[in-house]
Amino acid sequence: MDFKFDNQRNDIIAKLIETRTGQGITQQELADRIGTKKSAISRIENGQQNLSLDMLIKICDALGKKIEFDLADAPSDNMYELRIFDEPLIKLSLENRGLDGLVCDIKWVNQDKMDLMPLDMEITGKGVVKWLESRVIPKNRQFVDEILKTLGLSHNDTKGIIDVCKGLSLNDSYWIVPKDFKGKFADYNLYENPFSDILSLVAYTGQGQSAGVFTTSPELTTNGMLPKAWRSKKNGIYLYKGGTSGAANAGNEPYSEFYACQIAKKMGLNCVRYDLEKWKGILASICKIFTDINTSYIPIGRIVREGGLNACIDYYRDELGENAVEQLKSMLVFDSVIYNEDRHFGNFGVLRDNATGKLTAPAPVFDNGISLFNYAMPEDFNDLEEYAKTRMSAYNIDFDEIFLSIAGKKQVAQLRKLIGFTFKRHKSYNLPEERLAAIEEFIQKRVRHLLAVYKTNK
């Protein structure tokens, strides 16, 4: 059965019945006017007999009406618009085509708004699909299956996920909506509208219940592997991020976030501030969002796709200037101090003005949970310097080598601020004191070591 044709036919018949009854004409009177039987009119109005074009013209003439129609494009479940705010940027079709997978066909590009296009998207069919796939929840995120199960989706169903969440994110102000969608960004964006509490709980705990068909939730477009959830509070939006679990050395990531940001602050870096809190019985690091409806964050790896750290430094210099380069170098020195093993090309990047498309600044330093020897066992703290030799950066480059390659006078001055540094203890949640004291002692040795290395080699 073709429901689209049935619906159109039923709409026409409903209008004829409305007109007939509105004029006080009975089925028999209408039949007499057009020279047919009442039973024929009854069958047409009941949907038991198809309405021919000739019969439609006769009925309309008998009712004193004429037929007018336009050959409009049929609505399609596969037609979409990529928008920034309420501005259409690209009109496209998205279709799952069996073995070919998700296929995009670009129909129109807003050439007047090229400066506002996603910097990390190639404007081709394959480029759009790749961008959409990078936008939805990653397969390695904890509780990904539980999150998607809540909505009746699978992690391979990119189109289905986009249909449910409209591609809304807390990283930027893009969204993907059906063609001719009348809704306004102000009524749907995640910065100004309530979240789905159901999905936040599922994302953080792995437990929950079914949600509605459309959900205003950032969980479907948030990256990272740890359990996490965005929560909207009176004074802003906060990310709650738990730790790993299931092993003797698991669960220390929230502590590392809390302590590492103290080091960054002492050095004078532009950094995200972290606190600790228990939610649903799970310890989390919490931080306030650093994007907003007018400012987006783009991971550097989405823009600079080859060339490593040197290419990133060149990009910062070309797009943002020398001050931005110094900030990047300071972050890398900070990572060398705390032995950040997870500073990859997805957790540092740049901020962008959504209204103009111009880059404005480096993003603040964030995501330092896999640092300060969070995976170390108690016996490793008997000789942290020896244990540190087994740790490596995410770039597979020794931390000392990174430091020597990028440190300058500004970074050395920032290092000196750490002499005599100690952590501020949390009022409720802390690592064991002996572990924390050992890390403090190591930081002092590490700072002196790096200063000596710089003096010897510069």
Model feature map: region roles:
Residues 24-42:
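Short alpha-helical DNA-recognition segment
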